[in-house]
Amino acid sequence: MLPRHSCSLLLFLFLLPSVPMEPHPPSSTLPPFLAPEWDLLSPRVALSRGAPAGPPLLFLLEAGAYGEPAGAPANRSRRGVSETAPASRRGELAVCDAVSGWVTDRRTAVDLRGREVEVLGEVPAAGGSPLRQYFFETRCKAESAGEGGPGVGGGGCRGVDRRHWLSECKAKQSYVRALTADSQGRVGWRWIRIDTACVCTLLSRTGRA
């Protein structure tokens, strides 16, 4: 024989309206190693399902190509800095010639600790097909056959007095975030080095820079 208060509690629970429990939708949050810190991604890195059609907007602004007429070529991903300069600066020459473009087949890179890591070709995305990693790199223009002279990669810088200075055009690297795997198979977002400029290095012929 149950006490009276126990019977009242059972009757109360029985009379409660049944409230349908909605199933919780599965979390769309990616695992920690797959969720990039978006504020740390460089404009030189693109995560997309197809290769970008042109350079990053920030690159166009820095190169002075923003605001060109509508008839200007849209695809400048393989053009050098001198080719994207506005008409008012056509007479100027760069100390070192550079070419920029999207790298679509990068497989390895050097991370912040100087170790070689594998750059993953695909980045899993929630609710869709995976994304690919593209890197907009700037390198020194290679010397073409029969087109020797200053301003190309490995050559002397343009406009430098060779009587007093030894000069060379070299690629400059910067760090960007990318999804990589180390030698032990650990996957994560790491800082890797990519080519971002072509600069002139000088060495005094007297041994003092």
Curated annotation (Swiss-Prot):
Signal peptide start and end residues: 1-21
Propeptide: 22-79
Keyword field: Cleavage on pair of basic residues, Disulfide bond, Glycoprotein, Growth factor, Secreted, Signal
Annotated localization: Secreted
Glycosylation sites: N75
A GO CC term attached to the entry: extracellular region
GO biological process entries: adult locomotory behavior; ameloblast differentiation; epidermis development; ganglion mother cell fate determination; innervation; long-term memory; mechanoreceptor differentiation; negative regulation of programmed cell death
UniProt cross-references to InterPro entries, sorted A to Z: Cystine-knot_cytokine (IPR029034), Nerve_growth_factor-like (IPR020408), Nerve_growth_factor-rel (IPR002072), Nerve_growth_factor_CS (IPR019846), Neurotrophin-4 (IPR020432)
Cysteines paired by S-S bonds: C96-C169, C140-C198, C157-C200
GO molecular function: growth factor activity; neurotrophin p75 receptor binding
Cross-referenced PANTHER family: NERVE GROWTH FACTOR NGF -RELATED, NEUROTROPHIN-4
Family under the similarity heading: Belongs to the NGF-beta family.
Role description: Target-derived survival factor for peripheral sensory sympathetic neurons. May promote ameloblast differentiation and subsequent reduction in proliferation of ameloblasts.
Protein name stated in the entry: Neurotrophin-4
Protein source organism: Mus musculus (Mouse)
Lineage, uppermost ranks: Eukaryota, Metazoa, Chordata, Craniata, Vertebrata
